[in-house]
């Protein structure tokens, strides 16, 4: 017989003997405890089942009861030691068996004698252990045929109340706690006997690498922080991990989509599905109901609850039989309540009389045309003037039933009982008194009111105009890819420059010492010298543009676009057209605007994914991108006239940034859907915006982030708004072909609100077939004159 089987049998017999001894000690101790007076259940339970992991007390003087407890605990410890020994035999390494071959030969004779003596106890104990294991249900399904004897013993060793515990097969008994608590100690926990488990030697990366090649496990080894050992995963574990990673169930034997069987609506069965015995509480009177009833009985005895008598029941029945007619005195004219009600009665409003269009044979002028009928059908119910279409019938008998009759009666009933009626005293107030007292427009002159000159020459719509600081010249850009310079006083075109794309905007440099025009066309911004100023100004402009500046290497950072390069134009284009620089951009440029000192100008690319705003330095001939985040909503930008503030207008908001602090100062809430234009007062405290939804908003930035005034006087979208630099007037133009001139006085007193008065509506240009009207407008720098650019290709001066 193999040594392992013999050892298992001997150990099983020892285990059985130790169990019998422990049971006898417990019975004796229990008998003595029953004789003791004043013992409670909790103390008896604690003494019967002591903690086997702790050693006995070190006290020398013990009583008889404590001696019995000590014997019981010693028996439990001996039993646990044998179980640990048995576990070591079951999990021993085959190499240990090979090393102990000599010991097996020496102990062969003694083993045979032990087998004869322990044959019956071993068989009995093994049978009892197997029966106990079957009752507990702790048999390992992976046990092989060679380990049948050890499996029966293991069922005794690992019997536990919690079959799902992860510590049953682990030597470390610290429980489910974070193992980080043992990082600063030399041990990682405690074994079954309460002894410390020292940390194994940690391998470095080289040793782990060599072990992986020597073992040949293909990276299947994982580290167990509870035991401090490396565990090799089996094929079943690898397959389970792969199934979990792919979102499947870990166990392949589980079918999550089994056919549903309805036990209670299927065929009738002979035996019930659930037939548990009735619990005892179904046959025993409820203790809690008894307490509630006794509480009510005590309240009745104390007089807190009074039971109804027979007289009370008669009175109650007589009261229930009495009825009251709420409408019985409605016909009594002497009732004072009826008189008050009739005096305060308000008659219901009468139904509106039918109109001529509701006739079955209306006149011809009341019958809608096909276009009007189609427009009525496409309109919303709330937008329709009437809820029916007039029809003409030859006779009354041909008129069909009115399909809106029930709906109208229903709304009439709602109006009668849901709408409250009240008497209101009509106030005799003149509507003119409700309007604010505004000064007369004649008292607010000067302002432009009449057309003076017409500048013709462009073959397509004029998109932008700008006046030079001296007020002598006017530059315009058009969709015909030309830039024209006009003399304001005579209307003569003195220079024409042709570019390679449609011109979106032109802006004259506000510095009177140089003569430079920034032109946005296509993906390029060009700097042009018109050469219409004096010789000294043209020379200063040439010196500024031709100066050589050492530039750093321009490269793109990671994830960003490269900085635009300033391409210097030389030769014939510079001599004839006056183009000094061309700055290419990565998207179409829709706006250019200058700083009030003329050293910087900004360009806007609304369709760019990133870096939609560029700030260019004329003196340094360089470009910066102040905003790196993705923003495709930027429509307009503007420099503050006196402070280092930068306005960035998106479709619905206006953000104000401080260029020195590089921080957001405030965010203005416009309330519009799509912003189109932006202008700031020369003092810098007030701002106006125009939008494509026909609104003009005036912002007092010292007052609030919301509009101070919202003006809705344009019939179509607004294209441009502008302030005069000297006079308290501002203007707006739109696709309706009109230019509105308004008086806007800003007072130095911060406690007084700005005064806004409409003074003139100028019919400047005709609306073209594409729905465009006035594209741009600007004021003369020193005179109360207004220039307007129309989609009809003309430019007009209003004085």
From Swiss-Prot:
The keyword Nucleotide-binding does not apply. Residues 70-81 have a biased composition (Basic and acidic residues). GO terms for molecular function: ribonucleoprotein complex binding. Coiled coil: none annotated. It comes from the Eukaryota. It is found in: Nucleus, Nucleolus; Nucleus, Nucleoplasm. Keywords: Nucleus, Repeat, Ribosome biogenesis, rRNA processing, WD repeat. Residues 58-69, 93-121 have a biased composition (Acidic residues). Required for maturation of ribosomal RNAs and formation of the large ribosomal subunit. This is Ribosome biogenesis protein BOP1 homolog.
């Amino acid at each position: 017989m193999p040594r392992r089987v013999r050892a298992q049998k001997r150990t099983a017999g020892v285990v059985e003997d130790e169990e019998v001894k422990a049971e006898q000690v417990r019975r004796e101790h229990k008998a003595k405890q029953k004789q003791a007076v004043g013992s409670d259940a909790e103390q008896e339970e604690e003494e019967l089942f002591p903690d086997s992991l702790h050693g006995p007390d070190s006290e020398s003087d013990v009583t008889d009861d404590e001696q019995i407890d000590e014997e019981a605990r010693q028996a439990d410890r001996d039993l646990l030691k044998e179980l640990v020994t048995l576990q070591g035999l079951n999990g021993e390494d085959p190499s240990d068996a090979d090393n102990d071959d000599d010991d097996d030969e020496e102990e062969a004779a003694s083993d045979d004698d032990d087998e004869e003596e322990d044959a019956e106890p071993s068989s009995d104990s093994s049978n009892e252990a197997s029966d106990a294991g079957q009752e507990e249900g702790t048999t390992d399904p992976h046990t092989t045929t060679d380990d049948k004897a050890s499996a029966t013993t293991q069922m005794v060793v690992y019997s536990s109340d919690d079959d799902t515990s992860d510590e049953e097969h682990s030597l470390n008994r610290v429980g489910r706690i974070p193992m980080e608590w043992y990082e600063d100690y030399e041990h990682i926990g405690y074994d079954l006997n309460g002894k410390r488990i020292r940390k194994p030697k940690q391998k470095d990366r080289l040793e782990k690498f060599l072990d992986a090649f020597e073992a040949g496990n293909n990276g299947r080894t994982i580290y167990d922080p509870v035991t401090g050992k490396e565990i090799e995963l089996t094929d079943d574990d690898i397959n389970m991990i792969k199934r979990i990673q792919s979102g499947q169930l870990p166990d392949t034997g589980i079918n999550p989509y089994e056919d549903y069987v309805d036990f209670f609506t299927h065929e009738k069965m002979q035996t019930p599905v659930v037939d548990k015995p009735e619990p005892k509480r179904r046959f025993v009177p409820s203790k809690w109901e008894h307490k509630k009833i006794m509480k009510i009985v005590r309240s009745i005895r104390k007089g807190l609850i009074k039971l109804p008598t027979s007289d009370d029941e008669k009175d109650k029945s007589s009261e229930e039989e009495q009825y009251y007619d709420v409408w019985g005195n409605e016909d009594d004219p002497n009732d004072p309540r009826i008189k008050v009600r009739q005096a305060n009665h308000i008659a219901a409003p009468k139904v509106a009389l039918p109109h001529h269009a509701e006739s079955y044979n209306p006149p011809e002028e009341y019958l809608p045309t096909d276009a009007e009928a189609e427009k009525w059908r496409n309109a919303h119910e709330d937008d329709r003037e009437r809820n029916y279409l007039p029809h003409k019938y030859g006779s009354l008998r041909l008129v069909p039933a009115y399909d809106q009759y029930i709906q109208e009666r229903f709304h009439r009933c709602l109006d009668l009982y849901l709408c409250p009626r009240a008497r209101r005293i009509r106030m005799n107030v003149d509507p003119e008194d409700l309007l604010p007292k505004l000064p007369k427009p004649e008292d607010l002159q000067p302002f432009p009111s009449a057309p003076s000159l017409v500048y013709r020459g462009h073959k397509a719509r004029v998109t932008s105009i700008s006046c030079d600081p001296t007020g002598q010249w006017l530059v315009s850009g058009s969709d015909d890819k030309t830039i024209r310079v006009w003399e304001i006083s005579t209307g003569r075109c003195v220079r024409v420059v042709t570019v390679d794309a449609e011109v979106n905007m032109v802006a004259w440099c506000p510095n009177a010492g140089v003569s430079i025009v920034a032109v946005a066309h296509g993906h390029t911004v060009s700097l042009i010298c018109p050469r219409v100023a004096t010789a000294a100004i043209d020379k200063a402009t040439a010196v500024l543009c031709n100066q050589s500046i050492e530039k750093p290497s321009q490269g793109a950072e990671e994830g960003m676009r490269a900085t635009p390069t300033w391409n210097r134009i030389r030769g014939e284009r510079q001599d004839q057209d006056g183009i000094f620089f061309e700055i290419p951009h990565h998207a179409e440029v829709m706006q250019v605007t200058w700083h009030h000192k003329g050293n910087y100008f900004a360009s806007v690319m609304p369709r760019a994914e990133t870096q939609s705003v560029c700030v260019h330095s004329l003196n340094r001939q360089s470009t910066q991108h102040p905003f790196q985040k993705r923003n495709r909503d930027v429509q307009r930008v503007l420099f503050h006239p006196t402070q280092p503030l930068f306005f960035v207008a998106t479709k619905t908001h206006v953000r104000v940034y401080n260029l020195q602090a590089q921080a957001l100062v405030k965010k203005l809430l416009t309330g519009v859907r799509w912003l189109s234009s932006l202008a700031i007062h020369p003092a810098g405290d007030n701002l106006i915006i125009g939008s494509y939804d026909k609104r003009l908003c005036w912002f007092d930035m010292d007052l609030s982030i919301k509009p101070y005034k919202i003006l809705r006087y344009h019939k179509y979208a607004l294209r441009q708004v502008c302030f005069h630099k000297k006079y308290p007037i501002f203007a707006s133009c739109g696709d309706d072909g009109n230019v509105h001139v308004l008086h806007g006085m800003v007072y130095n007193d911060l406690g007084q609100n700005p005064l806004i008065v409409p003074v003139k509506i100028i019919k400047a240009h005709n609306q073209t077939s594409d729905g465009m009207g006035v594209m741009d407008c600007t004021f003369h720098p020193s005179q109360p004159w207004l220039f307007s650019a129309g989609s009809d290709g003309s430019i007009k001066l209003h004085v």
